[in-house]
A protein has these predicted regions:
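Helix-terminus/linker motif at the lipid-water interface of multi-pass membrane proteins
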Residues: 52-71, 140-147, 203-210, 270-299, ...
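Hydrophobic transmembrane alpha-helices of multi-pass small-molecule transporters
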Residues: 82-85, 197-202, 227-231, 303-306, ...
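Interfacial/gating helices of multi-pass transporter permease domains
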Residues: 61-81, 147-152, 212-213, 254-261, ...
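Short runs within selected transmembrane alpha-helices of multi-pass transporters and secretion channels
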Residues: 91, 160-178, 186-194, 215-230, ...
């Protein structure tokens, strides 16, 4: 196994031109739209391959194991995202802090932040792994997963959570690289790991007939490969962000700064999952077929959220470096440019998926009822994608400046509270699937409005604009 990892690292090393090619990017100077797009696209493609882990699981499980297995895997999505999103938020905190130090050219603080971040990844990964192993069944039962798929869903979730430590390490490691403007190496590693995932999915599920357990194990192996590759890269780097394993420890002042930004960012991300879990509970009441249809829709819908997450990560890093360099006018120009890019992507994806979504649906299931119901959801929800863009861009801009608490509050009110209130008090009067999921565009519009209002005050306080 170890020689395989060494070969993969050497292959990536030569593909990217080795250490002689400087993959870092200084966002404090240059053409803004070009910098954002060149940084954005590797993140987007990388997000696609990361999503491919679970998507390939779903396709192979749906085709090889049937509708019940598909529903079992799909029913775990919101709970796994709840935990995963929190450590992604922590990695955002690390990325912002390192980006600010990088923009300020503070080498000592970069060194401390890198090693503190890795220690945080290890500790948080252990905690989340233990949580998943011991409480998966109870959590799935609490959200109303039907008993005919509960055992399979619990098995998949427990095996998935075995990968929390390598998952946390990869997210922190890639966050470090992105903080210094390198979004290409994380992409290369994800491509390799996606290939590993597909191969092991085929072997374990199709050939060895290990069912959903095989799919979860394949994902675990792929996540481990990702963690090893990004760690090797950081260890052999000659730049200021080089990782030394013996120096991994907490530096308390830096840790406090990372947690101050990362914890609210993580909580903000988990709020989406909490609201979605509440909605999933109501969706589960419509039966196994609807659960399967919704799980397929969520996989297609993920294309939009990958794009938003990528542009959000791009503007956060851009702002972080410029905030560290005190270039406030450039920050405002970057936010406007990122918003224009986000709106263009939202409208384009809405059109493409509304017209071509049915073809993608057929990749996941051959059941006509699932295909028709999923297409109905696509036409009902996706035209409203544009209404979310302000949330991602303004939130990323504020976070890059070190302000993470206020965006969390706005998301709590506009997404979590409002969405839960809708399904609790309004949707029971309209007992259909659409009566539940219409809460999505309603909360997108509302939260964007809240961010627009607050961002005007934020600019005056931070930039004097």
């Amino acid at each position: 196994v170890i020689p395989l990892f060494q070969v993969m690292h050497l292959w990536v090393f030569f593909i990217i031109g080795g250490e002689s090619m400087n993959k870092t990017q200084d966002f404090t100077k240059g053409v803004i739209w070009k910098q954002l797009l060149f940084f954005f696209f590797p993140i987007l493609i990388g997000s696609f391959f990361q999503q491919l882990y679970n998507t390939v699981d779903t396709i192979i499980v749906g085709q090889a194991c049937g509708t019940n297995a598909l529903a079992a895997v799909g029913s775990t999505g919101n709970l796994t995202n709840l935990v995963v999103n929190f450590y992604v938020g922590l990695s955002t905190g690390a990325s912002v802090v390192i980006a600010q130090y990088y923009g300020a050219h503070n080498k000592d603080k970069i060194h401390q932040a890198v090693h503190t971040s890795y220690m945080l990844a290890i500790v948080s990964g252990i905690i989340m792994m233990l949580f998943g192993l011991f409480f998966s069944y109870q959590c799935l039962d609490a959200i109303g997963v039907p008993h005919d798929i509960l055992n399979d869903a619990s098995l998949y979730m427990r095996l998935y959570f075995l990968g929390m430590i390598p998952g946390a390490i990869y997210n922190i490691g890639s966050g470090i690289l992105r903080a210094v403007g390198d979004s290409k190496r994380p992409l290369y590693y994800l491509i390799i790991c996606s290939i590993v995932n597909v191969v092991f999915d085929f072997v374990l599920v199709v050939i060895l007939h290990k069912g959903i357990a095989g799919a979860a194990i394949a994902t675990f192996i792929a996540q481990t490969v990702c963690a090893i590759l990004v760690t090797i890269q950081l260890m052999f780097s000659k730049d200021v962000y080089q990782l030394t394993l013996s120096k991994i420890k907490f530096h308390l002042p830096v840790l406090k700064k990372i947690v101050k930004i990362g914890a609210p960012a993580g909580i903000q991300s988990t709020m989406y999952s909490i609201a979605n879990i509440v909605l999933q509970t109501h969706i589960n009441a419509f039966g196994t077929q609807t659960i399967a249809s919704w799980s397929v829709y969520v996989k297609i819908d993920a294309l939009f959220w990958m794009a938003m997450a990528a542009i959000g990560a791009a503007i956060t890093t851009f702002v972080g470096q410029n905030y560290g360099a005190h270039l406030y006018d450039r920050i405002q120009k970057g936010a406007k440019t990122a918003l224009a890019i986000a709106l263009t992507m939202a409208v384009s994806l809405s059109v493409i998926l509304c017209f071509g979504g049915s073809y993608i649906t057929k990749l996941f299931s051959s059941d006509p009822a699932i295909i028709n119901q999923c297409q109905s959801l696509i036409l009902f929800l996706m035209p409203f994608y544009f209404s979310y863009c302000c949330v991602e861009i303004f939130s990323g801009t504020m976070r890059g400046c070190g302000e993470s608490f206020k965006p969390m509050l706005l998301v709590c009110i506009g997404i979590c509270v409002l969405r839960v209130a809708w399904v609790t008090f309004i949707s029971p009067h309209y007992p259909t699937l659409k009566g539940v999921v219409i809460s999505y565009p309603i909360t997108w519009f509302t939260t964007s409005f809240l961010f627009i209002i607050y961002y005007k005050h934020f600019k005056k306080d931070h930039f004097g604009a």
